[in-house]
Amino acid sequence: DTTKDMVSMERPETGKSYFYIFNFLPYRHEFSNWTVTGVDAQYEPDNWAKAVNSTNFRKAFLYAINPAVTLAVTAPEGYENYKLHTITPPSFCANSKGVDYTECGGLANLSDFFDEAKAKEYRDAAVEELTAAGVTFPIKIQYPYNPAVVDWDKQCQVFKQQVEAVLNDGFDFISIIITQGPSDNFLNAVRRVGAYQLMSYYWGADYSDPETEVYPFYQEAGDRGTCYSFLRTGVEDGIVTGETADLVMQYMSMVENAKTITEDLDARYEAFADAEAFLIENALVIPLGMPVPPYIATRLNLWEGQYAPTGLSTNRLKGVHILDHYVSMEEYNANRDAR
């Protein structure tokens, strides 16, 4: 009991969200300022390229993934509070009427996606479509993690078990292959060089405008962008074709249109919200949740510190008092409510 009273949580990171990304560029590509090496041959990148080009395949994942299972690894109690069905977290910004951005435009129509029956419907449609395209099953899916991040390996394990239980029920559809990346320089060694097929990652807003939330997905023509999914590059290289190519380019156009709206903020927010909803509804990205604050032992009242929904203000310790005792969860909650 004494030890329990010495443990509380870090202050939540409200401007960050986690989501699942597909790699639409599984092959080597030379940008002017960066080289993507792509997926290793043992993970069958040709097979993957055909699969990820199928909206039915991606939507099977959209409805098969239960975010609660992954979040429960780090938040065994209260994980429902961290689930998201959008990429932008709530309370990020609001329009002139006080409507939260996540309730604007097309985002207002989104809710939790997890639905096993729907997932299997899309899987069955994908099997028929991909069999005709020459895809072999099970589809290998490299799913990497950073061993330096606490519990990421456990999250990968429960993710694999949960998703395969849904999508492999009655048919050997996928094989999620968990791989350990390096603990140092993980971004450059894995995500930025496209050495994955599916992975969970995050984005933190830089400023309080929805344009900041498009950076992991939007790319200008010929540009490497922020090296997340390589959506536009996949189209430019002819890997992403047909319906999916049309969806990708429509998203790019929606973002470009939203960026031009600078005088009517309500219209701007609605346009960006429509683009984000379009991205999610077509399973070009799959929401997961907000970061779960870790449990810590501290003598700081973290709620006295500076706060901003974006940027690094919450990392500053100016004005925070050092107490003569460790903060319990009861005191932590009282400090939060008193701010």
PLM feature segments, named:
Residues 1-36, 73-74:
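Extracellular/periplasmic solute-recognition and catalytic clefts
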Residues 9-15, 166-183, 230, 316-321:
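A generic structural motif
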Residues 3-7, 53-59, 66-68, 137-140, ...:
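Loop/turn elements at helix/coil->beta-strand transitions in domains of secreted/extracellular proteins
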Residues 24-71:
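Extended ligand-binding regions for polar small-molecule ligands
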Residues 35-48, 100-110, 224-227, 231-232:
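A solvent-exposed, charged loop/short amphipathic helix patch at secondary-structure junctions
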Residues 78, 111-117, 121-205, 244-248, ...:
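Ligand/substrate-recognition segments at binding pockets and active sites
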Residues 6-10, 46-48, 59-60, 108-111, ...:
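Generic recognition of flexible, low-complexity loop/linker segments
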Residues 12-15, 60-104, 151, 155-161, ...:
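Detector for C-terminal structural segments
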